[in-house]
Structure formats: structure tokens, C-alpha cells
Amino acid sequence: MSRFIVFAFIVAMCIAHSLAAPAPEALEASVIRQKRLTCDLLSFEAKGFAANHSLCAAHCLAIGRKGGACQNGVCVCRR
């Protein structure tokens, strides 16, 4: 009886492990970079106030980086 319980536990752990692993397609799709709105559409200047670099820096701070700046319309975050 104890062998059956151990075998059932091992099978259950293998099934749980296979269900918890991410699908390979999901890993590849997350690598694709998409353009950010902070440097393209939200770049504006009004009465001497330019919001392009500050919005990019805020975006980078929100994802845990140490700030950032716009370079050729792309937000580049510092490490």
C-alpha cells in the first residue's frame, strides 16, 4: 500500500510540474520588443516644458530600472 501511495505522489508531482511550466511559445513571444508610447506619441513641448525624457524615465523607474532617456524615438532604460 505504501508503494502505491509513493507512486501516486510521484505521478501527481510530475503532472503538477508539467502544468506549472510555461509554454515555449509564451517564452518566445515575450522577447519581442514593442515600441513605447513615451518617446513617440507623448513627446511634446509646451511653454518650455518638454515631457519626452521625463515620461521615459518614469516608465523605466516603474519597471525597476534606474531611469532612462529617449534616443531616436525609443525609450532606453539604464541598468
Curated annotation (Swiss-Prot):
Q: Which family does it belong to?
A: Belongs to the invertebrate defensin family. Type 1 subfamily.
Q: Which residues form the propeptide?
A: 20-36
The residues forming the signal peptide are 1-19
Chief subcellular location equals: secreted
GO cellular component terms, A-Z: extracellular space
- Regulation: induction: By bacterial infection in fat body, hemocytes and malpighian tubules.
* Name this polypeptide is given: Defensin
Q: State what this protein does.
A: Shows very strong activity against S.aureus.
- Cellular compartments annotated: Secreted
User: What species is given as this protein's source?
Assistant: Oryctes rhinoceros
One of its Pfam families is Defensin_2
Keywords, A to Z? Antibiotic, Antimicrobial, Defensin, Disulfide bond, Immunity, Innate immunity, Secreted, Signal
Domain of life of the native organism: Eukaryota
Q: Which InterPro entries match?
A: Defensin_insect, Defensin_invertebrate/fungal, Scorpion_toxin-like, Scorpion_toxin-like_sf
Query: Which CDD domains does the UniProt entry name for this protein?
Result: DEFL_defensin-like
